[in-house]
Amino acid sequence: MIPGEIITKSTEVEINNHHPETVIEVENTGDRPIQVGSHFHFYEANAALDFEREMAYGKHLDIPAGAAVRFEPGDKKEVQLVEYAGKRKIFGFRGMVNGPIDESRVYRPTDENDAYAGVFGDNGAENVNKKGGKRS
């Protein structure tokens, strides 16, 4: 062995193999590329990404640490998400959680929410979060 040498296994390393997986379709409805990193709380990703936000609550991309997924304008692709482990507390990002991951804290659109949003013209294709998530 050489000092500082790293000896790795000859087999592939499986990541997140003990976490439940969720696959969702995501579309970039914006006019600029959007990149989401491996540990970013996907529920809080850029509002120009159109997807079922409820499905992403408490989850991050199932990719190696330090990697990212890039969405070009108009891109539509499926991504695989896995649940956060550990203490399951999320702070920062867009400030939509700032505490424990708890399903009761997920924003779920209702007819009343949609009627209220309609007053301000937020009821058509321009509503990038029409499938769920927090309206900003």
From Swiss-Prot:
Pfam families: Urease_beta. Its main location: cytoplasm. Its EC number is 3.5.1.5. One of its GO terms (molecular function) is urease activity. It catalyses: urea + 2 H2O + H(+) = hydrogencarbonate + 2 NH4(+). Gene3D superfamilies: Urease, beta subunit. It is an enzyme of class 3 (hydrolase). Pathway: Nitrogen metabolism; urea degradation; CO(2) and NH(3) from urea (urease route): step 1/1. CDD domains: Urease_beta (cd00407). It comes from the Bacteria. One of its GO terms (biological process) is urea catabolic process. Belongs to the urease beta subunit family. NCBIfam families: PRK13203.1, urease_beta. PANTHER family: UREASE (PTHR33569:SF1). HAMAP family: Urease_beta (MF_01954). Heterotrimer of UreA (gamma), UreB (beta) and UreC (alpha) subunits. Three heterotrimers associate to form the active enzyme. This is Urease subunit beta.
